[in-house]
Amino acid sequence: DLTVTQWAERNRRLSSEASAEPGPWRTSRTPYLREPMDAFTDPKVRRIVMASASQVGKSELENNIIGYIIAEDPGSILYIHPTTIDAKEYSKLRIAPMIRDCPTLRRKVAAPKSRDSGNTLLQKTSPGGILTMCGSTEAHALASKPIRYVLGDERDRWATSAGNEGDPWELAMARQTTFYNA
């Protein structure tokens, strides 16, 4: 079984749209990301929380985790952003280029222009899984289906409540109860 770091080193390519240094992922450029990336594949770890400065690689860490899930351990992923606009922008500027530039992912996620591809702006379908991106205000996305993996970005900018439904993080966490390995 690969760790997220091993998967990223072997498969991930940084896209020119999102990286000052496009090309193969090198953990040596951000060695402090190795531990949280590898914690993701540690069965004893249930939750990873990071608080850090801007532009130190947290989003790329999450992208590596998403790539790893799609390629190695498929399941439903909910990736929460502060707003739906943020989720759409992230999908266009980060997720779509990552899929395009990573052959392993490109083989698993249908091209966005193919008919019935399952690849829309906010949902990317792959064998055994689906990546759903949403804003923290979207109660229906946060509470509508079972989710194995929950990722969140820019947590400090999230809404305090998803409509009248309550805390977005708690709504998302409740989606994991049916998965023994969430």
Show where each model-derived region lies.
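Phosphate/NTP-binding elements of NTP-utilizing enzymes
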Residues: 1-182
